[in-house]
Structures are given as structure tokens and as C-alpha cells.
């Protein structure tokens, strides 16, 4: 994540541990939430102080359960921990009564129609309390944008008007191993199995029992309801793109230039 309070050095770990220990020692209790990375899961002492200081959860950039996709995103911390240990890491964080808010990105070149079910299975098996999923966004002048542009796959390039599409809620490039319909079907599968009201309520009931922290469970419940609407909007954007014909025209152009 961008605002990683835990960091990646021994000095950083000690600073964070001392901060939350200081809050606990002084009787300071404040509901709070922070952004960090998976490597925090091994630091039980810090996690304990975080919970006692009022932390309700942490956001962690999981991004993908595909190793090649993680390499393409330079997610070094996740690769060092290895995907096999993701569930163990999440379980240990939740053991301290902290909700885990994961983020996932769809639209990588390695994504296939099977990716969406694999991700849903992982989210449910790992008991991730909140999962926010978005579409890979090729921000201007990034290596990703330059690569997609060089391959003639970008189709939202009429700037400044097209800046509105450069969020994680819009598709701006031709997909690699998916048709647009497969992508929409996959996103809809995620919505039905992660963001439905029934699933959100079920996760809330489980979180109350498993984390033994009502504040954390309520926090996750509220965020999930918010993201239910956000993800619905993402789906609407994809359907509007399909109806406009812009994607099919971009695909035809891409295929013609490949010949």
C-alpha cells in the first residue's frame, strides 16, 4: 500500500511498536485503521499493541494470487512471503482481533476466465473481512502505460477528456486473455459471491465470533456495504463500455495492427 505505516526495516518496525506500546502504556485508546503490508503478520507483539490501542483493522495490498502478476506489479513483499502463506498471514492478523481489508486487481495479462472463481475461493477460504477489487489502471508515464501503448492496446487516449476513465473503475485497454464479455461475467461473479447482502451479513456474523472484536466486525460490515455500491458502479461502467462499442472498435484496431 502507499501509506505503509509498518515499513520494511528493523528501525521502522521498532518505531511502530514503540508508538503503539506508548499509547497502551498511557491508557490512550482510539479507534483507528491503517495501511500496511503482509510482512506485519509475523510481528505478534506489534499486532497486540495495535489491538490494545484501538486498531480495528489494516488494509493490505494483496493485488493478485498469481505469481507472474505480482512480479509484473513489483509486489516484492508479497512474493517474499509467497502466496502459499497468504492464508496463514491473514489468520494471524485476525487472531489479534484485527479485520483484514485486502485489495485485488483484475485485468492483468495473466488473468483468464478461471481467475475470478479462484480469487473468490481464496477470499472466502482465507476469511478476508473486506475485499475491494478494481480494474488495473495504466496511469500515464508508468511502465504499464508505456507497454500497453506500445502494443496499441490503449483506447482511452483523448486527453484531457479521457482522464475521467483513469480510475480503478474503468477498463481503458484491450484485455490479453479475456473477451470483454468474459471479463464482465467474471466481475459479476465476484459481485454475487463477495458483495451480495447475504454474503456480507454472513461474514459479519462470522467475524464477530472469530475475532472477538465487535468494533472490528462492525467496521468491516460498514465498509463492505459501501463497497457493494462501488462495485455495482464498476459493473455498470463495464456494461456501458460494451454497449458503446468502443471496446470492440479498439479490439478491431488492435487486431488489424498486429497483422
Q: PLM ranges: what are they?
A:
Residues 13-212, 236-239:
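A structural motif corresponding to the C-terminal lobe/cap of the Radical SAM core domain
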Residues 1-6:
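Active-site groove signature of glycoside hydrolases
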Residues 204-259:
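Membrane-proximal basic amphipathic "stem/tether" segments
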